[in-house]
């Protein structure tokens, strides 16, 4: 029997069977926890860990590498420290911190890791794009000048401090001056674009706020029909400092998902003061050297690399496709002409704009809207100090009709304020001065706008034309806003084509004559 078995056949059978064995062994690079405290862990043994890499603890908690030292790695925890003990095993994921994004996120409230926190179940992330949290800003050749307006629906902003798509415009002021209100009104105003099939996707990033405040804001957006095109990224005061630090980066990554696919997007960071405080906390626990006001030396770089990611991308498809630092998943899906507009918010203490973080962000952004407590308390809302508010993009981010009508409004209002200061000391004044003061006061009343009631740009141009050209001379100061409402109601019913023409950026003699005729009828009823 044995003489029938050939050794070559045995070896052949063994080789065939060995080929079928799946070698499923996988080696994970692991380390052990040395110390853990205040949301930071030090880990020994991860010699090949990279900066910003995700690590996974054996209990499922995730962390991000921040410090690379000779004998250990310092990482910030994206969860609670309870359950993490000395000696616990930590493994590398070999993935840089990122967030998975797709259109199913619209209308949802998520945390900086992309997990839903609104109680509506998990988000379907099938075919989602993996967008890195930290990414280089597009280079100069991949950008184009900001030239398209981002309508906020606020007369004071759209006429005097215009914001363009791709711009970074800082909203700065003390607490309780209406900073968030401006950002929320801007988001609500994008509803008409969404309904017209030209959506501006909005991302609202809440950093270090009370969970109840975020819930109220989400409810407000729902009531005004703004949630279908909005994503809320929430890192509340109860979340670890690392989550508050990374929340704006998650917002920017989601914004880039829309921007790189050719859509306009708007991201609101509310507010970066709290992000800087969270970053300071994490840095001090990691024993990084501190600088001015105990902030780490690279706090300027923290905000500059975040805000530089806002851009208007080149229209040329072949140029946009070559964009630097493009995530692998985005290749083949890039479309030129997209934009990411940033509205960072900074809270000042007692109106001090010369503090460390405010001056940093002012120098990074393309202008600022400065809100004042005094104006707010006097009833001028939005409480914008036009004198020191500025948009460095200017008229190139306005439609032609608005530019023509409101081009001198900012200077006129500044002159009015100077004259008003002098008029307090003077008993008699000439007719020109009296007229300038009257027009300035009435324009101030026109620029007052209730919260959550953004105005379409065509209507803005029409009413500002009346204010700038002194068509409301006969109207008493306390009846200006009542007159405005009557004028707009009549214009909508009797000459809707005027509003459409102005919204399209055109203004001609026929249009202005209709505006003057309608206002003359309304103003005539106020003659004493």
Indicate residue ranges for each PLM-predicted region.
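Conserved P-loop
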Residues: 180-228, 253, 260
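P-loop NTPase nucleotide-binding/switch module
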Residues: 88-90, 97, 101-104, 117-167, ...
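Conserved catalytic/coupling modules of large nucleotide/cofactor-utilizing molecular machines
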Residues: 274, 281-528
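Phosphate-binding/switch loop-helix module in NTP-utilizing enzymes
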Residues: 243-279, 331-332
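Loop/turn-to-beta-strand initiation segments
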Residues: 199-201, 228-231, 262-266, 337-342
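Flexible beta-alpha connector loops of hexameric P-loop NTPases
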Residues: 144-150, 175, 202-207, 230-247, ...
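Acidic-enriched and Gly/Ser
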Residues: 2-17, 23-26, 32-150
């Amino acid at each position: 029997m044995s003489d029938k078995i050939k050794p070559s056949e045995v070896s052949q059978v063994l080789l065939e069977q060995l080929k079928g064995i799946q070698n499923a062994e996988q080696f994970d690079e692991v380390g052990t926890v040395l110390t853990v405290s205040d949301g930071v862990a030090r880990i020994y043994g991860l010699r090949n860990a990279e900066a910003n890499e995700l690590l996974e603890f054996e209990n499922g908690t995730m962390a991000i590498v921040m410090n690379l030292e000779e004998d250990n790695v310092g990482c910030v925890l994206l969860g609670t420290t309870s359950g993490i003990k000395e000696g616990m095993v930590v493994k590398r994921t070999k993935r840089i911190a990122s967030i998975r994004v797709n259109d199913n996120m619209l209308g949802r409230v998520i945390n900086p890791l992309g997990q839903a926190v609104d109680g509506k179940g998990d988000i379907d992330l099938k075919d989602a794009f993996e967008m890195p949290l930290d990414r280089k800003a597009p280079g100069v050749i991949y950008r184009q000048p900001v030239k398209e307006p981002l309508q906020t629906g606020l007369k004071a902003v759209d006429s005097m401090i215009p914001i363009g798509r791709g711009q970074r415009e800082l909203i700065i002021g003390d607490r309780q001056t209406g900073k968030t209100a401006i950002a929320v009104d801007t988001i609500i105003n994008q509803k008409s674009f969404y309904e017209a099939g030209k959506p501006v996707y909005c991302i609202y990033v809440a950093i270090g706020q009370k969970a109840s405040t975020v819930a109220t804001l989400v409810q407000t957006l729902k009531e005004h029909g703004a949630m279908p095109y909005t994503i809320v990224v929430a890192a509340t005061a109860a979340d670890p400092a690392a989550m508050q630090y990374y929340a704006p980066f998650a917002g920017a990554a989601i914004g880039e998902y829309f921007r790189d696919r050719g859509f306009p997007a708007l991201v609101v960071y509310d507010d970066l003061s709290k992000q800087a405080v969270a970053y300071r906390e994490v840095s001090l626990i990691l024993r990084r050297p501190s600088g001015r006001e105990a902030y780490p030396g690279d706090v300027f770089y923290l905000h500059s690399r975040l805000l530089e990611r806002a851009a208007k991308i080149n229209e040329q498809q072949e140029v946009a496709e070559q964009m630097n630092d493009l995530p692998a998943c985005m290749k083949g899906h890039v479309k030129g002409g997209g934009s990411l507009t940033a509205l960072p918010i900074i809270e000042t203490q007692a109106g001090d704009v010369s503090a460390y973080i405010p001056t940093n962000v002012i120098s990074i952004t393309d202008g600022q809207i400065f809100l004042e407590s005094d104006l707010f308390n006097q009833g001028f809302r939005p409480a914008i100090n036009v004198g020191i508010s500025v948009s460095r993009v200017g008229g190139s981010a306005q439609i032609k009709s608005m530019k023509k009508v409101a081009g001198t409004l900012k200077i006129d209002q500044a002159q009015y304020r100077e004259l008003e200061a002098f008029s307090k000391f003077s008993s008699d004044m000439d007719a020109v001065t009296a007229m300038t003061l009257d027009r300035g006061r009435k324009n101030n009343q026109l620029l007052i706008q209730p919260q959550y009631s953004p105005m379409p740009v065509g209507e803005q141009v029409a009413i500002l034309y009346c204010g700038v050209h002194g068509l409301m001379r006969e109207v008493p100061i306390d009846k200006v806003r009542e007159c405005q409402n009557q004028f707009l109601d009549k214009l909508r019913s009797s000459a809707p084509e005027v509003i459409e023409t102005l919204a399209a950026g055109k203004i001609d003699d026929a249009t202005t004559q209709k505006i003057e005729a309608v206002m003359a009828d309304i103003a005539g009823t106020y003659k004493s």
